[in-house]
């Protein structure tokens, strides 16, 4: 009767069945192709008399396509000013070499203001291609005279060049900085004054700020 054991588990990544010698994955979270494409394990076989034999094997990993990640971000704009959103506003990272941002899906619309693509209102779930982002077609516009920190929030998911989406949506927050509006709409309380009138109740100008 023989028994099997591992004298080198590759840092806890692998285990072996003592009776059958079947090698299994002990901790899959430690298997990362981008960090290491192979690992060495050392198998020890022991016979009934207690004699042992050790041999080291190389376990090669197969790469799998992993989902990308976006980034929570904040954009600060000026009151009454439209802002063009670019790829940089959404962030993108992917552990797979060669994968790049291909699109952004708008999961929920801004809580205030409007979001348009080429002048047309964006709908929840709409996919915005990177070509449109590069062309400046995605535009956020706050409501007239509106401002404030955290004025609007929207959620989004980035997509890589293999059409995988980030499984966890991110949030884009828009801060709108107030500006001092110039006075407008002058009006006159009356446009006639009686001949030789005394200045008891002269006409007055009024302005809406």
Language-model-detected regions and their locations in the chain:
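Acidic, turn/loop-rich segments in luminal/extracellular domains of secretory-pathway
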Residues: 1-69, 74-186, 191-199, 204-209
């Amino acid at each position: 009767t023989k028994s099997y054991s591992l004298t080198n588990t590759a840092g806890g990544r692998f285990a072996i069945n003592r009776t059958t010698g079947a090698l299994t994955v002990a901790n899959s979270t430690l298997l990362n192709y981008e960090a290491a494409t192979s690992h060495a394990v050392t198998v020890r076989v022991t016979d009934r008399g207690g004699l042992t034999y050790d041999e080291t094997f190389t376990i090669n990993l197969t790469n799998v396509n992993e989902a990308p990640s976006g980034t929570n971000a904040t954009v600060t704009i000026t009151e009454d000013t439209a802002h063009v959103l670019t790829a940089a506003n959404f962030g993108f990272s992917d552990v797979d070499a060669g994968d790049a941002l291909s699109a952004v899906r708008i999961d929920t619309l801004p809580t205030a203001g409007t979001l348009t693509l080429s002048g047309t209102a964006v709908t929840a779930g709409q996919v915005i291609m990177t070509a449109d982002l590069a062309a400046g077609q995605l535009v956020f516009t706050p409501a007239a005279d509106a401002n404030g920190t955290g004025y609007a929030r929207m959620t989004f998911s980035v997509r890589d060049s293999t059409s995988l989406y980030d499984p966890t949506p991110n949030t884009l927050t828009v801060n709108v900085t107030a500006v001092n509006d110039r006075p407008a709409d002058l009006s006159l309380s009356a446009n006639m004054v009686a001949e030789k009138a005394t200045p008891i109740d002269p006409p007055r100008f009024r302005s809406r700020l």
